[in-house]
Each structure stands twice: as structure tokens, then as C-alpha cells.
Amino acid sequence: TYINSAADLKAFCFFFGGIICTSSNATKILEWSFAQREKVLFFPDQHLGRWSGYKMGIPLDDMVIWNPDLEMGGLTREQIVRAKIILWHGYCSVHQMFQPRDIIKFRNQYPDGIVISHPECSFEVCKQSDYIGSTESILQTVKAAPPNTRWLVGTELNLVNRLAEEVKHEGKIVQFMASTICMCSTM
């Protein structure tokens, strides 16, 4: 499970021999998990699980979404048996709001602009981004970039605003990915 999960989810994970991950180590944790078992339940963020599995070379067809509100997660027995990763039908409300159209609009306005996104963004957003990384990775990547670069950042607004302030003296322009704002209630 994810580090920001509730204590009861962490306990559930521990009880069944699972492990807790962060966005920076999710791929390594999945590798460890597959060394223990042939199938992984990744929760609660489906997008982080999907992107991490994809980075490992697991085909999207080998990942299914488990909806806890439906009998058998809304899946057939065959889908469950065939899946390598079962993704819990959950997501971060902040990262969920970013859309591919935000990236397309940015690229049309700033062809030399660079897009960096958190792996909790949708698969489509991640695929269209130049870089994908944890919060710390986003900070390091933008700070290490050459001066006078323009960035579209797909993560929490306060982090983006702080980063923009930190690098503006280098001529870097950092902007929030979404045109609408949803503040994260858990950060």
C-alpha cells in the first residue's frame, strides 16, 4: 500500500505479507513483491500502480482494476487469474484532475516547454509528459534544469507555487498543470 494510506490499510497489508511504498520507490517495491508472489494487489492509487508496473514492462492488459463496490471487483474469474497486477479503484483527487488536454494546450503555447508529472497522474498524462517522478524528483529535476526553461508541473499546487518562487531568479517559469484548482485535503 501507499505511505499516505490509513493505518487500517497498512495493517491489512502487513497481515498479508505486503509492504508500504512511496511514489519514489513504488517500482522497486513492485519488483520485491513479484519476487515473493506472481500477482500483486496494488492499493490505494491505481495510477501509481499502473505507471510502476508499466515501467517494469508489464503490459497494460496484465493489469486490471478492482472496484470494491462490485461483486468480485467487477471482474471475471478469468481476468483475476490472468492479471499480474490488480489495481485498487482509487486515486489522488489532486493528480486525477490533470488531463492530456492541459499538456496539449501548454505544448501549443510553448513548444520548447517541458512537462513533468507525478506518477499518481493518469496513465495518459504520464505518457505525454517529458519526465515522471516523485515529489522530490520533480523538485530536483526542475532545480537542476538550465536557466530560462519553462515547466508545466502536474502535482499539488502549493508545491508548484513554492518551486516557482525558488527558481524564478534563474529565469525558470514553473506553472501548475490544471486550469482549475483542487486543493489536497491530505497534504
Language model segments and positions:
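The feature marks the mature, well-folded catalytic cores of soluble enzymes
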Residues: T1-M187
